[in-house]
Amino acid sequence: MGRAFEFRKGRKMKRWSAMAKTFTRIGKDIVMAVKEGGPNPDANSRLRAVIQNAKAANMPKDNVERAIKNASNKDTANYKEILFEGYAPHGIAILIETASDNNNRTVANIRSYFNKCNGTMGTQGSVEFMFDHTCNFRIAKDGIDAEELELELIDFGAEEVFEDEDGILIYAPFGSFGALQKELENRGLEILSSGFERIPQITKELTEAQIADVEKLIEKIEEDDDVMNVYHTMKEE
């Protein structure tokens, strides 16, 4: 198995915050998708993907429909996606994806978390190159052979296809999302969820005490409502 498999296995044992936080993230994704491509999921592939993710997270249908309606209102503020980079203690690179309606607030908050936890906020491009930006899809098994599917999807950008207890996972470079989504839909395969992840190219092993130092910063960052995802180069068991 490749790095995507190991990455997924490691993160699975860790976080995904409380359900309320997950719903907040999906709500922001809906706003950004609607503002970008309109409220009709049939004509908006990004919104279609977010709705699939909402279903996978057991977000009530009424909540999704209400969020789409609110996002369609021109008075509803859009969110700007901002990427922050820096270092946690012990040389661990940190990459933070945010979606904010107030850039100044988000910058100040992220900077304060680094300062309070003995980290260092970096400049643009300081650690992003240490991560591979990927897209992923989870589809229903339905008797599908993962190895055969991988061979069939190589021309659409697929790099790694593997099975777990919840379905079949497909990983590809970030830029292959549209082509893969279209091909999976054309094949009539049920997409359970999809998204983007940044996979560290190299990870660093730490002692238990050092891990606690890094986790303190990560947890502080993840508590912020503007934060969507946090990635790092610390090795996870």
From Swiss-Prot:
Keyword Transcription (UniProt): yes
Localization annotation: Cytoplasm
Chief localization: cytoplasm
Disulfide bridges in this chain: none
UniProt entry tagged with the keyword DNA-binding: yes
UniProt keywords, alphabetically: Cytoplasm, DNA-binding, Transcription, Transcription regulation
InterPro entries linked to this entry: Integrase-like_N, TACO1_YebC-like_2nd/3rd_dom, TACO1_YebC_N, Transcrip_reg_TACO1-like, Transcrip_reg_TACO1-like_dom3, YebC-like
Similarity section: Belongs to the TACO1 family.
Protein name listed in UniProt: Probable transcriptional regulatory protein Fjoh_2560
